[in-house]
Every structure is written in structure tokens, then in C-alpha cells.
Swiss-Prot record:
This is 2-succinyl-5-enolpyruvyl-6-hydroxy-3-cyclohexene-1-carboxylate synthase. GO terms for molecular function: 2-succinyl-5-enolpyruvyl-6-hydroxy-3-cyclohexene-1-carboxylic-acid synthase activity; magnesium ion binding; manganese ion binding; thiamine pyrophosphate binding. SUPFAM superfamilies: Thiamin diphosphate-binding fold (THDP-binding). PANTHER family: 2-SUCCINYL-5-ENOLPYRUVYL-6-HYDROXY-3-CYCLOHEXENE-1-CARBOXYLATE SYNTHASE (PTHR42916), PROTEIN PHYLLO, CHLOROPLASTIC (PTHR42916:SF1). Belongs to the TPP enzyme family. MenD subfamily. It is an enzyme of class 2 (transferase). The keyword Transmembrane does not apply.
Amino acid sequence: MNPSTAQARVVVDELVRGGVRDVVLCPGSRNAPLAFALHDADRAGRLRLHVRIDERTAGFLAIGLAVAERAPVCVAMTSGTAVANLGPAVVEANYARVPLIVLTANRPYELLGTGANQTFEQLGYFGTQVRESISLGLAGDHADMGSLNAQWRSATCRVLVAAKGSRSANAGPVQFDIPLREPLVPDADDGSAYAPEGRPGGKEWTYTPAVTFDQPLEIDLTPDTVVIAGHGAGVHPNLAHLPTVAEPTAPYAQTPLHPLALSLIRPRQVIMLGRPTLHRSVSTLLADPAVPVFALTTGPRWPDVSGNSQATGTRAVTSGAASPEWLRRCAEVNRHAVEAVRGQLAAHPLTTGLHVAAVVADAVGPGDQLVLGASNPVRDIALVGFNTADVKVRSNRGVAGIDGTVSTAIGAALAHERATGGRTVALIGDLTFVHDSSGLLVGPTEPTPRKLTIVVSNDNGGGIFELLEQGDPRFSDVSSRIFGTPHDVDVGALCRAYHVESTQIEAGELAAALAEDFDGMRVLEVKADRSSLRALHASIKAGL
């Protein structure tokens, strides 16, 4: 067995022992030893392999798998620009704390700076965005394979520990750079997938128990308190009775408080869970120096955009009790805000993305998974009052980019189907869909979702800018082109190019379409208007 083949087989074997169940592979020559080893493991049923031709979408497919599985997922690629294309996914994984392992095949390090083809200083390329950048070192002919086997397995365990946050409580992306020398394919007489042995019984070479990160924080609940639950909020049963502004990706709120209702009440303190990113009303409250903020997170970092947090911890140790009158008032304004939104939607003469979101919110139920685009859809779902128990909600909120959303949805759907057999509904805008349309390319030999519906709310451009400063009517002569970016893409034709079923329907037909039994992956396109979004949102606020 040649050294590169042995090294790749050992790495793959140890990754499987460490909990990796899915790997995304992009084709290339330099990563051929890894490709052969991964294919052997896939064929043996030890992991599930997904082959993609675009490294950028491959990275987000891996993120979708990792988030839904709550387990590390690898993406493997060749050297050169293939590595650079993982940049967006690595940044998202960093801030969303996703255990993404980037297996970067490299040329022997002595070729750096020589002008060798497809070669650059890729080890450490991701800089501060990864938990670790680890090099396996170059495999060479060596009489003591036992020593090399131990070194390779030990390094792989370090990668897994860093990605899972086993010693830091801070999961995230890791670069695992593996320089490989020719030959890059198995020897002609190497007829089996043999690899040097690991620990007996399939155990990890170096076992590291997960660290317990526990910082109790005493909080008196006597002052009128609201909970703001953002991305990665975690579950806090002793706070469940408090009025909670829960972003869609936060756990189900037993006592919901609509984000627009914050303008109708005067909280005396805030308990912030996770990382809120969506609502300006929330940002305004968190920045109020007269309102103490207690930040509870599941890891070592905590958000504090305004610098107003008074104390931090991981869980609350509570004293005192909320006033019944305060709880009653919050429940009342929550109902009022939800009714104001739904009432204005019913009265509005045009179909907008908010209307599409309302249908989707009402259609998903327990056991479903909902994937949301990072622009208007995730905000719209919150505004229409979505708060359904036992629905897994995913959205790339780490740095909230629109890139890779189709691929994230496919990865999440594959993981959700394997775990529960349930369906996945994705709600995304047209720009988000077009931006990652190559994510629809799933080869005929690759695992494909059997219960994925992608709802594309198509208002032919960037509807979110209608609601921002750039959408002010005084910029109307230029904003449509440089912010709205109309594209006139034929969504149906684009889907047909990738052999994905697509149907254009009216908003009034969407509920029935979502209720249909469907086997496979499909796109439901709903035409929407963005020119009236600003007026619609103004009428909602006026209705409060």
C-alpha cells in the first residue's frame, strides 16, 4: 500500500470512529486518495458520501447536514482555488458554531513558492475563522507504519475535538490540510480497503469527553421582564413562563411575545438568550441604558452589540416572581400585534412575500423542518406570528448571508429524513434561490431528498431593500436598479435544467400544494410584489 493511500484510509477510518456520518466530496486529482477512501467507506455503509462539483455549494450542503444532525460533517476538496471557495461556508460555520471539517488536499510543502501548478499557501488560509488549522504532514515511505498510524490518528482526533468543541464548548470549523505525494491512486495489487488498525472495538484513538460549560447567573424576576431568544438560544425551562420574543430559529416559546409588541410595553429588564439578529425593535430595547440586560449563551462568547449587558452566564438561577398583571398585559399586546399583522395582510390588495410567509407558517406542523432564507423570509415568518411546537427551524444566521441557502436546505432535508422521516419546507426569496441555483445540481448517483419542497417567493429582486433606508421614495429613481437588482430569471426553466420539478402557483393555491403528498424534491414558485412592501409595513405599524 502506497503512503498516500494508507494515510487517507487511516484518516477516514478515524473520522468515522469520531462520529462523522456524512462527507461531501468535490472531485480533483490531488485529493484522489481521500476520494478512494471515502468511496470505500460509503460502499461499506460506514458513512454517506455526497459528491458535488462546486466547492462553495458543497460547503453549505455540509453545513445543512451538520446543523440538522448536530454532528461534525466533512467537506473534502483538491488544492488551489477549490480551497478558497470554502470561504463563505467557513465564515458562516464560525459564527454559527457549526462543526465543519474542511479536508484540504495539498501538494507536498516543498513545492510552495516554486510555481507548481494549482498550488498556494492554503494551510492557514482561513485565518481567524477556524478553530484550528492542522496539518497532517506528508506521508512517505517509512518502515514503522505503526508509528505513522498513531500520529495520523492522533492528529485526526485533534481535528474532531476542535470541531466539536469537546474541550472548549465552542464548536466550529477546522481546516485539516493533508499534503499528498504521488502515487495518488491505490496500487494495482491493492485489492482491499485495508487500513492500519485503530483502537479495538471501533473506539477513537484519543477519547475526549465533552466539556461541561456551566455558569449559573442569579436573576431576580420581580422587575417586569421580557426574554429575547435569538439564534442558538438553548432551552431554559425556568424562563418559559416569561413573555418571549423568539426568533424563528430559537426554541419554541411557550409564552410568545410578538416583536412589534415591544413598542407597546415598557420592560424593566431583559434576559437575552443566544444571539438576536432580526428585529430593530429588539436592538433598540437591548441598547436602552435604562434597561438591564442579562446575557445567557451556550458557549464562551456572548453578543453585546450596544455594550449594555450587565451580566453573562449560561443559565439563570431565578428568584422572585413575575407580576400577573405584567404577564396578562404582555399576552394581550401579543394577540393585538398578531391580529394587526394578519388583518393588514387580509386587507392588502397585492400578494407580497409576507403573504407567502403566512401561508407557509400555517402549513408546517409538528415533525416538519423549516429552512428559511436569511433575508426577508426569516423576518417575515417571525412577523406573521409563527410559533409552532416541534418544528425544527433552520437558517444561516451566523453571518446571515444569502449564499448557499439551497444547498443548506438540501443538506438539512437529507439529515432530517434520515433521523425522523419527516418533510422539509424551505422558504427563500428569488435572489437567494438564483444565487445558489447550482445547489440544485444533485447527480443521479447521489443521495437526494425525498421530502423537500422549496417555496420561492419571487418578487424579482431584493425586497428587503424596500424596507431599509435605501428604499426611501427619494431614492426611487436609482434604488430599483442598484439595490432591487431585478433579474427576470425564469425559475421554472432554471429548475428544468437541473431536472427538478417546478410549478408556478398563486399564493391562494400554496396551502393546498403544501398539503399534498409529494415524493422527491420540488420547487413551488409564488409571484409576489415588492413595490408595496413599504406601505404594507407602515400600515401594520399604524394598526398597532
